């Protein structure tokens, strides 16, 4: 099992992908201990002095004006967790739950939350033991933090709710803790609120969408290059000079990726020497422009989400150096919601452009290939309905890409009167990614079929590798057969990131 030494506020995108991708052991760097202890000492000093501070010895939300006696502070924190665990829907998978917990550990360890090191270590213990809290997918509006999902996460620390160990059966949390060799904990002043308040669920949802978008982008570049070759499209639109004079960095970098794949030393490239074709359709010619714009959106979202993954986003915040506790609004996940909306646009456009290239391949006048990429048309329908499936998926994504950040519903008796809807903004990215992966699967199949039909012509070594990868699982389409398994096989290869390995990373 891999290990990660967590330096608070210093997680990288590659580390976050590692956290999401598989179980690992977390160790908190000792440099964090002093700041954590100082913030707790500040909270204890406020209590000892009899001062009133929101979240430490008051109620919450609209009840913030209610002073809580010292004798009730432990019960206050426990009641907060129990009452706020009100989510609905299917539980999050182990990978997402683990990412949420690590994001929360990272935030709390910055030393601005007034939470004891022992509580943070208890959360680390869940991660290291492979304990997954039952966290329903729905129930947060992304302000005042992701209260419901983080409450469900925190229930497990208290021995409440449900959890499972290393992908096993869901159990009462006390049984899951016992199986993992762990004990329930008791929360002190402010600790329940520190656990519940924050954008970690929203950020994890959007990060999953970001990782999917990065993979889809790379796969789409490979599929688009394959289609360009199958359609005998020109390489000239990828000339670096075109893109340099526009100056759009995403476009420049996207064009370089196409050139990386479309080398000049191939039979198809040599076939263009006496070509009379002047211009290709936009779905081939404008790939660097469209995909470059998508890359820019993905990169900008990555920058926002990386900052949020390392942020302190609970409330109130403890500034121990000044012996001060300040109420603010870092729990508001508007940056995450807008980043997720931008990722949605990129995922939708990647699929939309791919679907147009598939349609081009179906049209014999455009591709100069047999209609629907099959011989003996009429008897055989070939890729006809596969393209319809791609169109259906691309169209569905257009609706799903509607921005969520422009929506808001007031909650908590209008105390929380503007919210981000970041969790929903991030969560819909998963369905969109699945749809676009389906579109790309059809394009990969169609491009490979078209290349097969260009008898005697081969493409570049990298693109031949992409064709070979597919042909190991899916044979050439000689006559009509049950088509769905072919699409599923291509989807599985895409999900396993086989095509992304043909390109350098695009976010770093």
UniProtKB/Swiss-Prot annotation:
It comes from the Bacteria. GO terms for cellular component: cytoplasm. It is found in: Cytoplasm. The modification 2,3-didehydroalanine (Ser) is found at residue 144. InterPro entries: Aromatic_Lyase (IPR001106), Fumarase/histidase_N (IPR024083), HutH (IPR005921), L-Aspartase-like (IPR008948), Phe/His_NH3-lyase_AS (IPR022313). It catalyses: L-histidine = trans-urocanate + NH4(+). Contains an active site 4-methylidene-imidazol-5-one (MIO), which is formed autocatalytically by cyclization and dehydration of residues Ala-Ser-Gly. Its EC number is 4.3.1.3. One of its GO terms (molecular function) is histidine ammonia-lyase activity. GO terms for biological process: L-histidine catabolic process to glutamate and formamide; L-histidine catabolic process to glutamate and formate. The keyword Cytoplasm applies. CDD domains: PAL-HAL (cd00332). Its main location: cytoplasm. There is a cross-link at residues 143-145 (5-imidazolinone (Ala-Gly)). Keywords: Cytoplasm, Histidine metabolism, Lyase. Pfam families: Lyase_aromatic. It is an enzyme of class 4 (lyase). Pathway: Amino-acid degradation; L-histidine degradation into L-glutamate; N-formimidoyl-L-glutamate from L-histidine: step 1/3. Belongs to the PAL/histidase family. NCBIfam families: hutH, PRK09367.1. This is Histidine ammonia-lyase.
